[in-house]
Amino acid sequence: MALKIAVVVGSLRRDSFNKQLAHALASLAPSDFSFDFVDIGGLPLYSQDYDSDFPEVARAFKQQIADADGLLIVTPEYNRSMPGVLKNALDWASRPWGQSVWGGKPGAIIGTSVGAIGTAIAQSHLRGVCAYLDIVLMNQPEMYIKHDESRIDANGNIVSEDTRKYLQTFMDKYAAWVRDRRV
């Protein structure tokens, strides 16, 4: 039986390095894994006023998360934190109160940035939010990747053999994590 992974990329940029990373990771996954790249760009800014009349785009987003066996969150780092669009998506799928679809889902966080420490601080902030939402995160390996086109090209192809080995380690552990914990 195929395992469906919801991929949430915290960047809306057309040529996002994190989208490239997400596609590179998907190429390393076991054959029984399928990846659903979830669009978060169409979600309006969350307000509790929506709880009584949930927009269709938010219902569809929540359903994509609910239907997934696992989560892969790929985030850039903006001003030493996660992007607002990613936090907004996390909020939408946790609402209305008591109707979160995140709880118990096995997940992992990874990201890339041009900064020297990659996405270390964004991932730290994101881990706190995910813990509150009861997403069961893989703790190791943590990967904070400094973006470099000699590693992954603009099409999401892994260029460097060292990068392939590095990311394969992540994917192998992630695949085992999801298999062992899927709800």
UniProtKB/Swiss-Prot annotation:
Q: Any keyword Oxidoreductase?
A: yes
The free-text note explaining how the cofactor binds reads:
Binds 1 FMN per subunit.
A GO cellular component annotated for this chain's UniProt record is: cytosol
Residue numbers binding FMN: S11, L12, R13, R14, D15, S16, F17, N18, E77, Y78, N79, R80, S113
Its Enzyme Commission number(s) read 1.6.5.7
Q: Does the keyword Flavoprotein apply?
A: yes
Q: Keywords in UniProt for this one? A: Flavoprotein, FMN, NAD, Oxidoreductase
What's its top-level EC category? oxidoreductase
What chemistry does it catalyse, as a reaction equation?
A: 2-hydroxy-1,4-benzoquinone + NADH + 2 H(+) = benzene-1,2,4-triol + NAD(+)
- UniProt-listed InterPro entries: Flavoprotein-like_sf, FMN_Rdtase-like_dom, NAD(P)H-dep_reductase
Q: Which GO terms describe its molecular function?
A: 2-hydroxy-1,4-benzoquinone reductase (NADH) activity; FMN binding
pH sensitivity of activity: Optimum pH is 5.0.
Cofactor(s) needed: FMN
Q: Name one Pfam family in it.
A: FMN_red
Function recorded in the entry = Involved in the metabolism of 4-aminophenol. Catalyzes the reduction of the auto-oxidation product 2-hydroxy-1,4-benzoquinone back to hydroxyquinol. Has a broad substrate specificity toward benzoquinones, converting them to the corresponding 1,4-benzenediols.
Family stated for the protein in its record: Belongs to the SsuE family.
Assembly behavior? Homotetramer.
Name of the molecule in the record:
2-hydroxy-1,4-benzoquinone reductase
Lineage at the top is: Bacteria, Pseudomonadati, Pseudomonadota, Betaproteobacteria, Burkholderiales
